[in-house]
Amino acid sequence: MEAAICELTWHEARNFRKEGDLCLAFGSGKYKFEVVEGWFKPPKGWHFGWIPAVACDLQGRVFVYSRSEHPLVILDSDGNFIDEWGVGILKDAHGIWIDAEGNVYCTERNNHCVFKFNPKGKLVMTLGTPGKPAEREGEPFNAPTDTVTVKPNNGNAPIAALFVSDGYRNFRVHKFTPDGQLIKSWGRQGSGPGEFNLPHCVRVDRYNRVWVCDRENRRIQIFDLEGNYLTEWRNLLRPNSLFFDPHDDVVYIAELEHRVSIWTLDGELIASWGGGKPNERAGEFLGGPHGIWVDAHGNLYVSEVLVNGRIQKFVRV
C-alpha cells in the first residue's frame, strides 16, 4: 500500500495559537493537540541524555526511558517525579512496552536484552544475556530495538505471545512464548517483502496484525501473527515507533525526520506536524521523534533522540 505523503509546512500544520499564553496547537480535524510547555519536571539537578522511549500505564503513570543515570523515571500525568526503576540494571535505553497487567518491558539495544519488570518495579524476567550479543547470526539478540505482547483477549489472537524487533544488526523479528521461549523468527537484510533494513519497532493492532517499523527502508511492513507478509506502507520519514489508538482505528507514528503523523489503519493521513528542519519551538522537534504513546485520556507523549532531555506532552483538544 502506498501511504499518502504530507507536505504541510509548520505554518500550514499549525492550527491556532492561544493569545495570552504560550500554548500552541497542532494537528487537524478530530486530532488537534495543544503542547504543554514545561511539562517534564524531573528532580532538581538531574540531567537526562537522549530519551528514546515513553509509555503510560492504566494508572496514569508516565514512564520515561532514557540514556542517563536515571534510566527509567516514573512521573504523574502533570510531569512530577514519582519513582525510578532499573538503576544498575538498565544500560542502553531503546524501546518500552507496558502490557495490560502493567508489566513493563525495557528493550536494551547495546545491552542485547529485554528486561521485564512487574508493576511494582521488580525485575521478573530477562530475555537474552545482558551485555552479550547472539553468538550466531539471526539468533536473539544483536542490538534489539523494541518489544510488544499480544494476548488472547486482543481481538481473536489464538495464543499469547511476545514479539521483539532485532534490530540494528540482526534484521529479524522474534516471536516468544510469554515466559520467553523462542517460537520462531523471520526476516533478513534487504528491501523486499519480509526483509528489513533496521526493524526499529514492533506493535500488534486490534486485528492481530504485526506492524514493524522498517526504518532505513522508510516503510512499515505488516504481517500476520505467524510472520507472513501482508502489505506495507512506503514513503514514510524513517519511522521510529508507532502506537495504536485504543478506541479507534488510528495509528500514531513517530518519524525520525522531525514529524509526527496520524493515520487511519487503511493508510489515510489524517493529521501531522513537523517534517521540516529541526526546530526547538515548543511542539516541534529538535532532534527526532523516537518514542510515542497515547494515554487513556487521549493525550500524546513524544520523546526525542539526537538531543538531550527532550520529551513533550500534547493534550487533545
Where are these predicted regions, by residue range?
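Eukaryotic scaffold repeat domains enriched in small/polar residues
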Residues: 6-8, 13-317
